[in-house]
Swiss-Prot record:
Signal sequence range: none
Pfam families the record matches: DUF167
Database matches in HAMAP family: UPF0235
Gene3D superfamilies hit by this protein: YggU-like
InterPro entries per record: DUF167, YggU-like_sf
SMART domains referenced in this protein's UniProt entry, alphabetically: DUF167 (SM01152)
Record-given protein name: UPF0235 protein NE0395
Gene Ontology CC: cytoplasm
Amino acid sequence: MSWYSFGNDRSLLILKLYVQPGARQTEAVGICGEELKIKLAALPVDGKANRALTEFLAKRFNVPRKNITLKRGEQSRHKVVEVCQSSNGPEVLFSEMRAE
């Protein structure tokens, strides 16, 4: 199993994420088991961490935030997220990691 998969027509990207809220900055940090670990600067209060996650993913995948759907894990660190209509693949989440 992988931390990502594609829907039938490849216009849907499904991500399995492990999210760590309350970090110094928002960034993808690497693979943790079968999930991609993402650190979020936002705290898990009043949905702020989920909003920060969807904003981060929308920016990385160059899609509107409405194209990012949290399918599972609204109140968990383990999340399943769908990205619709992105021309970018999952490798865009690692762009900052390679630059360092």
